[in-house]
């Protein structure tokens, strides 16, 4: 049985491939666009059966000429995840139409389809639950994800021929994101800031939040891969699910966890947030005017639906997850 993973050389896709490998599954077709060649490194430690360029894959899907038999599932992680990309034509073709074509093909062939949605569909809301009235995206990226989720809702009412699951990823961090540049996680950037400068920067006060007190639901990519595989194991489950920890933690906590993990590797003692700020190991910069009115100061996944689907594993909190990530970066990137 063959499994297809799109975006396989990317951040979440490569972690799904790795998680499948850990189960002994290697009959994997990795689909991606390697025009940014450094992404190949994410697949170099994985075992796959074949690589297919994204554009060729899309052509074969649209013409119904994919040569693979007995496809067990499609994990669709390939998308433009740059929330600052305002090219609506590109975003809608790459994130919406491509996903719609894949859905139609998977439904025709009765293949389970697990795809990446996003918490960006909620915009600046303060309640993050999988309900239409709570969804108000702020940018074309969020809209592209929102629009496809509406397609799934309609298809579910009409009746599905095979499993379809959309995961609304919250703030994901972890190994294999180094190719993402400015779109990499805050933990990634803090690690490199600290290694280069000996301190990290955080946004100052804004929107009623104090220095570094804006909060996010930070979720480890290890947990994201686990949840994807849980639904792969349960093809009877379909729907849209938030994928976060259910906890909202301050950027201050993330910065402190990153700096302290780096300090621990240097043989230095852990410091409190107050001490880190006093010693200027954490510094605050003015909140950018360009982000005012477009910035989520708070996110927290409501994971009630995920728990009701039977997923009982505990998620890493920021401290434990970031410690694991910093250890990986020190071993692989430093």
Swiss-Prot record:
Pfam assignment, any one: Epimerase
Cofactor(s) required, per the database record: NADP(+)
Swiss-Prot/TrEMBL keywords: Carbohydrate metabolism, Isomerase, NADP
Reactions this protein catalyses: ADP-D-glycero-beta-D-manno-heptose = ADP-L-glycero-beta-D-manno-heptose
CDD domains xrefs: ADP_GME_SDR_e
Single Gene Ontology MF annotation: NADP binding
GO biological process: ADP-L-glycero-beta-D-manno-heptose biosynthetic process; carbohydrate metabolic process
Keyword hit for S-adenosyl-L-methionine: no
Family matches, as NCBIfam families: heptose_epim
Annotated protein name in UniProt: ADP-L-glycero-D-manno-heptose-6-epimerase
Source organism of this protein record: Neisseria meningitidis serogroup C (strain 053442)
Gene label: hldD
């Amino acid at each position: 049985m063959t499994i297809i993973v799109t975006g396989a050389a990317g951040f979440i896709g490569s972690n799904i491939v790795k998680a499948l490998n850990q189960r002994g599954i290697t009959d994997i077709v990795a689909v991606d666009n390697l025009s940014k060649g450094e992404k190949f490194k994410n697949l170099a430690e994985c075992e796959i059966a074949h690589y297919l360029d994204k554009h060729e894959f899309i052509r074969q899907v649209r013409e119904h000429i994919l040569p693979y038999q007995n496809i067990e599932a499609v994990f669709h992680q390939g998308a433009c995840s740059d929330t600052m990309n305002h090219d609506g034509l590109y975003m809608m073709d790459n994130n919406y139409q491509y996903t719609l074509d894949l859905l139609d093909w998977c439904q025709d062939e009765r293949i389970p389809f697990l795809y990446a949605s996003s918490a960006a569909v909620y915009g600046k809301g303060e309640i993050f639950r999988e309900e239409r009235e709570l969804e108000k995206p702020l940018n074309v990226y969020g809209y592209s994800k929102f629009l496809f989720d509406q397609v799934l809702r309609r298809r579910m009412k009409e009746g599905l021929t095979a499993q379809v699951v959309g995961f609304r990823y919250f703030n994901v961090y972890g190994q294999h994101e180094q190719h993402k540049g400015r779109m990499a996680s805050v933990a990634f950037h803090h690690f490199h800031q600290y290694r280069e400068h000996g301190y990290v920067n955080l946004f100052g006060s804004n929107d009623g939040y104090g220095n570094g007190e804006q909060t996010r639901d930070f979720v480890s990519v290890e947990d994201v891969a686990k949840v994807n595989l849980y639904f792969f194991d349960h093809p009877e489950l379909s729907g849209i699910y938030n994928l976060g920890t259910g906890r909202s933690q301050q950027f201050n906590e993330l910065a402190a966890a990153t700096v302290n993990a780096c300090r621990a590797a240097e043989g230095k003692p852990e410091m409190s947030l107050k001490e880190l700020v006093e010693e200027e190991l954490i510094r605050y910069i003015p909140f950018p005017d360009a982000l005012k009115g477009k910035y989520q100061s708070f996110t927290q996944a409501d994971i009630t639906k995920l728990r009701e689907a039977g997923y009982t594993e505990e998620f890493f909190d920021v401290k434990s997850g970031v410690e694991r990530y910093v250890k990986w970066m020190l071993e692989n990137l430093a």
